[in-house]
Amino acid sequence: MDQYSSSLVDTSLDLTIGVTRMRVEEDPPTSALVEELNRVSAENKKLSEMLTLMCDNYNVLRKQLMEYVNKSNITERDQISPPKKRKSPAREDAFSCAVIGGVSESSSTDQDEYLCKKQREETVVKEKVSRVYYKTEASDTTLVVKDGYQWRKYGQKVTRDNPSPRAYFKCACAPSCSVKKKVQRSVEDQSVLVATYEGEHNHPMPSQIDSNNGLNRHISHGGSASTPVAANRRSSLTVPVTTVDMIESKKVTSPTSRIDFPQVQKLLVEQMASSLTKDPNFTAALAAAVTGKLYQQNHTEK
Amino acid sequence: EKRNMLQDEINRVNSENKKLTEMLARVCEKYYALNNLME
């Protein structure tokens, strides 16, 4: 019986309970999902904040850099030449534009400023252009004008309107001096050198030791090309300066027009002296003046 | 159904986080490059 009864003992493994338990463990509860969602949302928020902060910092830094580059560009333009082309917006990283959302700095304002400045510079240069005419020896074929400054030749070209070449010089007295001159023989009179000066020297005239005899005689043109600037600049020279009307110079092509002026002056003085000494009235007056002076001196000494 | 919705939302936010992390990395890279340039 016991054996039979023992055979009635429930020997089932009750596996269904286990299966149920396992199924519950595989599917996370809704609360866990909600927690996970909250966690990722918080992370998302934190990332967004960090990104915003980083973008702000980046924008500030970028703005500083742009300002610095603009400033250096402007100083470069002031000193030398037209600016380099601005970096094309296409070259800007699309990401930085999109993410940073920074308004790309408009280059139109800078360009306008630059154009205005350039125009002003051009007008200043135009104002200071002066033309000076120098008389040279007919045999002299060089394009060298001795005006007291040192010049460095940087070019020469043949122009259509004039058969003689035009030489370009830059002032070599000071590195910062931007004065340039063009020298070309006059079409009307090949013995006249036409020097066109652009700008104004920012330094005093170099030593005039060698300049006393070596300077060309300059002729200021009677027309409108000659400016007071040129006249003032030349008047500072210690050499005899003659102002000759070009209309006259056209007519006078004889060798007398090429006489050296110091010689003429010397001749005039000699002529005046000889004519005075030959005049008996003058010698008598001179003798009277001298004796009178001597008499006066003797009288006061006594 | 609610769990599915939650799971979808988690996936979406995770994907967004991944993108944000990538963007942040790039901005950081640019920032430090610019910073080095300035220095």
From Swiss-Prot, chain A:
One of its GO terms (cellular component) is nucleus. GO terms for biological process: defense response to bacterium; defense response to fungus; negative regulation of DNA-templated transcription; regulation of defense response; response to molecule of bacterial origin; response to salicylic acid; response to wounding. Belongs to the WRKY group III family. Residues 140-206 bind DNA. It comes from Arabidopsis thaliana. Gene3D superfamilies: WRKY domain. One of its GO terms (molecular function) is transcription cis-regulatory region binding. PANTHER family: WRKY TRANSCRIPTION FACTOR 36-RELATED (PTHR31429), WRKY TRANSCRIPTION FACTOR 40-RELATED (PTHR31429:SF3). Signal peptide: none annotated. It holds the Pfam family WRKY. The keyword DNA-binding applies. The keyword Transcription applies. It is found in: Nucleus. This is Probable WRKY transcription factor 40. Keywords: DNA-binding, Nucleus, Transcription, Transcription regulation. SMART domains: WRKY. Transcription factor. Interacts specifically with the W box (5'-(T)TGAC[CT]-3'), a frequently occurring elicitor-responsive cis-acting element. The gene is WRKY40. InterPro entries: WRKY_dom, WRKY_dom_sf, WRKY_plant.
